[in-house]
Each structure stands twice: as C-alpha cells, then as structure tokens.
Regions:
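Beta/alpha (TIM)-barrel catalytic core signal, keyed to glycine-rich beta->alpha loops juxtaposed to Asp/Glu
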Residues: 1-175
Length: 175
C-alpha cells in the first residue's frame, strides 16, 4: 500500500525513486512485489557481510540499487583505533568494539594497513575503493563529521584495485 502511494508520486514526477532502508528479505520482497523499489540501504561492511547471502543477490537480480550504511563500521575500518583506544561513546555498546572481537577486528585492519601502505594510501581510502569496485554496490556514503573528512574520503577515487587485491581484501574478512 505504501509503495503503491510512492509509485503514484513517482509517476507524477514528485519523487525520483522509491527506496527502503533496513528491510528484511521478507519485507523487501513484499515491498517489491510489483517491481517498484529502486534502491535499498542496509548495513554492510567488510565486518558485517550478511547482505551477501540474500540481499545483494536479490537486489542485483531485480535491478535494485544497493547503498551500504556504516561502510567504515563506525570508524573501525579507518585504521584509527588501537587496542588501547578509549571507546567511550555509543561504540562501546557495539559488539565489533568489544573484547576479543575488537582485537580480532584490529588485527584484520592491520592487514589492510599493509595493503594500503603498499598503495601509498590510508586504510579508509582502501576500504572505500574496495566498495567502489564491487559490482553490487551502487553508491557509498561514508559518514563524515568534519568537512576535512569529506575531502579525505574523495582520495579513494585515486586508488585503483585489481581483482586480485579486491579478493585479498575480501579474504581478510572471510566469514
């Protein structure tokens, strides 16, 4: 019903696209039963890759654009954290930033740092470049709190990854 109303607005030229966010597969299939969904935004990053199981294949099959949120895993995939970094904000409740999982994630990020260093790049730029190379990702919107971060993120466009490098990065975060 809601998607039908959005379709009417799209047909009238009042909106350009119909998008959904945080939908389960069941919800997405229901919303897209008439093929009207244009874009879905869902959590996806190198540390949380569940979208690869069903969501990304479904989106590709139905020509639905996919936009990941938390592409840098709340900063964890930027390389700025160490095991001694104080995590005092909302991240302290995120399992990615807790205990053994945090240390394991940091070890993976250090492997990324090796690849980034070889490419004379920062870890965050390498990760963003990896997204841009994925055929199932249509746009990446990394969060930025400072204007300088936006300018820094643009540097990802200058990193060219080979298929082998993308596979190497994916392999570091194998589920």
């Amino acid at each position: 019903e809601a998607v039908g109303a959005l379709k009417k607005l799209k047909d009238e030229g009042k909106i350009r696209a119909i998008g959904v966010s945080n939908f389960s597969m069941e919800q997405l299939k229901e919303a897209n039963k008439d093929g009207y969904v244009d874009v879905i935004q869902s959590e996806y990053n190198l540390l949380k890759r569940q979208a690869e199981d069903e969501l990304l294949p479904y989106a590709k099959e139905h020509s639905i654009s996919f936009v990941p949120y938390f592409p840098l895993a709340s900063g964890l995939l930027t390389g700025k954290y160490t095991k001694n970094s104080p995590i005092t904000d909302g991240r302290s409740r995120n399992p990615l930033f807790q205990g053994a999982a945090f240390e394991d994630n940091l070890a993976k990020v250090e492997k990324l740092r090796e690849i980034a260093t070889a490419k004379e790049a920062e870890v965050a730029h390498l990760v963003l470049a990896w997204y841009l190379k994925q055929e199932t990702i249509d746009a990446v919107i990394p969060g930025a709190k400072q204007p300088e971060q936006v300018l820094q993120n643009i540097k990802a466009l200058n990193i060219h990854l080979t298929d082998e490098e993308c596979a190497q990065i994916s392999g570091i975060f194998k589920r």
